[in-house]
Each structure stands twice: as C-alpha cells, then as structure tokens.
Amino acid sequence: MQSNLSSFNKIEQKINGSRKISNYLIGGMLSIGGIGFILAAISSYTGRDLLPLGNPSTLLFIPQGIIMGAYGVIANLLNIYLWYLVFINFGSGYNFFDKDSQSVEIKRKGLFKDIEVKLSFDEIKSVKLDISEGFNPRRRIALVLKGRKKPLPLSGAGELKPLLQVEEEGARLAKFLNVNLEGLK
C-alpha cells in the first residue's frame, strides 16, 4: 500500500494487485511443467521423443502416459487462470480518503467486475491493525464500521510490510479520520 498525500485534506493509497514477481515465476514454471507433461504423454502415445531431455517414448501410455497427460492438462488450466489474474491485475485498486467531503472510496479490481465501496466518515468506528505472526503471518490495516461485525480490509492481500510501517500507517490514518486505533497490545 503506497500512500500519496496530495494535500492535508486528502489521502490516496495505491494497492498493488496480482502483478507480482512471484506470480510471474509461478506462471512460468506452470507453463513449462504443463507443456512438458503433455509432451511426455504424447511421446508415450506416439513412441517418438518430443522432449529434448529424457526418453519419454519408452513410458507405457497406460497408466503413466495418461496420468502425465492429466497432470499437464490440470497444470495448463491453472496456468491459464493465473495468467488471466495477472493480465487483469486482480486485487489492484486504491483507497481514497477526503476530509473535505467526509468520504472514503475503496476500489478494487475483481475477477469479472470492479468492486467499489463508498462510505462517509460517520460510518467508521475505528481503524484496526490485524497482526498475526507465525507460520502464515498477516499484517493488515482495516476499517471497523458501525453496524458491521467484520472489518473492511484496506491493505492488499499478500502484502507483508514491516510491523513498524504498518503501525505508523494505521496511526496516521486513525488520526486523519479522527477515530481510535485498535489492535495494538
């Protein structure tokens, strides 16, 4: 979440989506692996080596070739889905806070349509820091809304910033919105 202060009365935070290096690496590995498994399955069926490494033509088509073909098809389906998410930049968007109009606008790129939430400052109860350490750590800033049990997350999914930076951003936002900051122990 990159914070850009255009003036003292407005805050705009850009949220990064699925265009991350890790998604490009996983997509590349899935592409190579899926195509490799399909070529190995075709090689075992036709008896000709279509891969430069190994000797897949010696594999029995039933059951090894069929299983490798199924793995290749599954990998390529996952690969198409992942590249689609990267192409549309799933999860990207922005958070916009405006003191002049007392409004908050949260916009994210969804799978099939954009998600847009507009709130007034009166609907915001507090800013919450959701911090959990361990095997699957999470450091996220969220808005606690009046009349809603679950907080509305502001940070992008998969962002793991230093704890001090998350606390500073949460405190700055709580001060800007003139609400309490929850989650600090």
Curated annotation (Swiss-Prot):
The keyword Thylakoid is assigned to this record: yes
Keyword set, alphabetical order: Membrane, Photosynthesis, Thylakoid, Transmembrane, Transmembrane helix
GO biological process, one term: photosynthesis
Record has Transmembrane helix as a keyword: yes
UniProt subcellular location: Cellular thylakoid membrane
Residues of the signal peptide: none
Cellular component terms per the entry's GO annotation: photosystem I; plasma membrane-derived thylakoid membrane
Family assignment from sequence similarity: Belongs to the Ycf4 family.
Annotated protein name in UniProt: Photosystem I assembly protein Ycf4
Taxonomic path: Bacteria, Bacillati, Cyanobacteriota, Cyanophyceae, Synechococcales
Gene: ycf4
